[in-house]
Amino acid sequence: MAFNFDAQEILDRALDLWNSIPQAGQWALAGLGALYVAQPVLSFIQLFLNCFILSGTNLRKYGKKGTWAVVTGASDGLGKEFASQLAAKGFNLVLVSRTQSKLDTLARHLELRWSGLQTKTLAMDYSQDNDADYERLAELISGLDIGILVNNVGRSHSIPVPFLETAREELQDIITINCLGTLKTTQVVAPILAKRKKGLILTMGSFAGVMPTPYLATYSGSKAFLQHWSSSLASELKPHGVDVQLVVSYLVTTAMSKIRRTSLLIPNPKQFVSSALSKVGLTGNEMFPNTYTPWWSHAAFKWVIESTVGATSGVTIWFNRKMHVDIRTRALRKAEREAKKQ
């Protein structure tokens, strides 16, 4: 069957249809069309402003000098840097991590550096999911004027691994630490923030929580869980004056990432945490509410993906799979070389 298309006839019919719409309807449709076309432009402008022009919420909103901040996973990496920079801003610290000796060393260092700083420490292994540990945390912070909670504790896979080959202990630890540990800590600390009618909860997210990541499937799922949990919690605690924000990051030079060199796309912990604490509340161009990507190149990279192929598209998943297969291959070869040296 042959179809004959008359372009002029199609155009005339389209114009007739348009003219049959009441003028108010025409204006409404034109406005919707303009918004659709303008949305990427407005999103890019918001991205630029957030990255380079605007400052986030002043942390003094959450308490005067001497207010306490709780930091989990505090002895290394981003957690250690959050503790250091919060101390520099005048917050006393409750430091929670697995190794008491590391906590003691960090606490002494910060107290010597910042005159008048007070610290409290709690060694707990989040992978054990021990209710007694959370009871000790509740007892430790009882009576403290806490203004900030940083949910930084987390674990990823040792190397990219197919889900069917993931060790059961590793799978269990990732879910227990990233999900249960974050939730239970927040249940202990958040009532204090809500009672004082002001507070901030920062929870570390990840690109892997926004973009499905093969060969890191369990970690990716745990961070996606935190994304939705954090957005939901933000709505619940807003009437109580508590701001809840998910902090999205790509790669940072930490022990978890196993990356040592910085680059345009990979900041060090000091750079990343500085941006995280200075950009609180700048969430205008994000897919999810109450979420922000503080490091400028991470934010730009994420915006490009979301504005083109899409964060959850087949193309993005394929690229993530290829990248992590390559990382796994290199890691296994390195392990083989080291084994031969022994």
From Swiss-Prot:
Q: Where are the transmembrane segments?
A: 25-45
- Binding-site positions, NADP(+): V70, D125, D133, N152, Y219, K223, V252, T254
Catalytic reactions of this protein: a very-long-chain (3R)-3-hydroxyacyl-CoA + NADP(+) = a very-long-chain 3-oxoacyl-CoA + NADPH + H(+)
Catalytic EC class: oxidoreductase
Pfam families on file: adh_short (PF00106)
Q: Where in the cell is it found?
A: Endoplasmic reticulum membrane
Q: Which domain of life is it from?
A: Eukaryota
**GO biological process: any one?**
fatty acid elongation
UniProt keywords (A-Z) are: Endoplasmic reticulum, Fatty acid biosynthesis, Fatty acid metabolism, Lipid biosynthesis, Lipid metabolism, Membrane, NADP, Oxidoreductase, Transmembrane, Transmembrane helix
PROSITE patterns, alphabetically? Answer: ADH_SHORT (PS00061)
Q: What is this protein called?
A: Very-long-chain 3-oxoacyl-CoA reductase
Organism name: Chaetomium globosum (strain ATCC 6205 / CBS 148.51 / DSM 1962 / NBRC 6347 / NRRL 1970) (Soil fungus)
